[in-house]
Amino acid sequence: MDTWKVGPVELKSRLILGSGKYKDFGVMREAIAAAKAEVVTVSIRRVELKAPGHVGLLEALEGVRLLPNTAGARTAEEAVRLARLGRLLTGERWVKLEVIPDPTYLLPDPLETLKAAERLIEEDFLVLPYMGPDLVLAKRLAALGTATVMPLAAPIGSGWGVRTRALLELFAREKASLPPVVVDAGLGLPSHAAEVMELGLDAVLVNTAIAEAQDPPAMAEAFRLAVEAGRKAYLAGPMRPREAASPSSPVEGVPFTPTGPRPGRGPQ
C-alpha cells in the first residue's frame, strides 16, 4: 500500500479537500465520499463566528478527520490564537497554518508564518504551513519541525493551474531534506493535480475547483483519479524527454529503408 504520513498520522488518500464554497452540506458530503478523502480542512474562525454556510459544519463532517486551519489570520499572533481554538473545538493536534495579510492576492506572509510555526511547535502542534513556493523558507520550516510544507501552485481560488512548476520542481529535487510536500491553492482541473503528482510530490489540497464545479461529486471523483494516475506515473518511472524523435519500431531490414547519407550529414 502506497501510504504517506503527516507526523504520526498515516494516510492512504493523497487528496485533501477543503470544506468551503459548497452550496450545501449534502453536496459537500457527496464530494468527500467521491474523492475518498480522509482529511478535510475547516476554517476555525468561520465556525467559531457562525459565519453563513458554516453553522453545523463540524457536525456535517462527522466521520471525517478534520484539519483545522487558521484562515483569516493576518498575523502570527492571530494564527496562534485560532490554532488553540481549533484544538479545543476539534480535539485535533494538527493545524493548517495560514497567515495572509493581503486581501487582494491572498499570498501568505513568510515572516509571520515562520514566527507562528515556531510558537505552535513549542506548544506541541503538528504544523502544516501554507506558503509560497520558496525552497529556502521550506527548509527553514522543516528545520523547526513542521509536519509538512504546503507551497502554492497559484493564488488561492484562481484555478490558474501549476503556474509555479519550475519552483515546485526544486521541491521535488530536494524532497530528501523536506517533510511531505502538499501542493495547495490554484489547482483548477484534475490535470493540474496529475501534473503535480507526476513530479513526485506527496499530495494536493483542493477546494474551489471541486466546490464550484457544476457537479462537485463528479469533479471530486475526477480529481481522485487524477491524483492516483499522477502518483502511479511517478512511481512507474517516466521516460526522459529526448531532443529528437526516436522511432518506436526498428527500421533496419525494412523494405525501402533509405540507405544513402542522411540529410545534413554529407557523404559517408
From Swiss-Prot:
Enumerate the residues binding 1-deoxy-D-xylulose 5-phosphate. G157, A185, G186, N207, T208
Q: What HAMAP family does the entry give?
A: ThiG (MF_00443)
Q: Which organism is it from?
A: Thermus thermophilus (strain ATCC BAA-163 / DSM 7039 / HB27)
Name under which the protein is recorded: Thiazole synthase
UniProt catalytic activity: [ThiS sulfur-carrier protein]-C-terminal-Gly-aminoethanethioate + 2-iminoacetate + 1-deoxy-D-xylulose 5-phosphate = [ThiS sulfur-carrier protein]-C-terminal Gly-Gly + 2-[(2R,5Z)-2-carboxy-4-methylthiazol-5(2H)-ylidene]ethyl phosphate + 2 H2O + H(+)
**What subcellular compartments does it reside in?**
Cytoplasm
How it assembles, according to the record, is:
Homotetramer. Forms heterodimers with either ThiH or ThiS.
What's the family?
Belongs to the ThiG family.
Q: Which UniProt keywords apply?
A: Cytoplasm, Schiff base, Thiamine biosynthesis, Transferase
Sorted alphabetically, the Gene Ontology cellular component annotations on this record are: cytoplasm
Associated pathway:
Cofactor biosynthesis; thiamine diphosphate biosynthesis
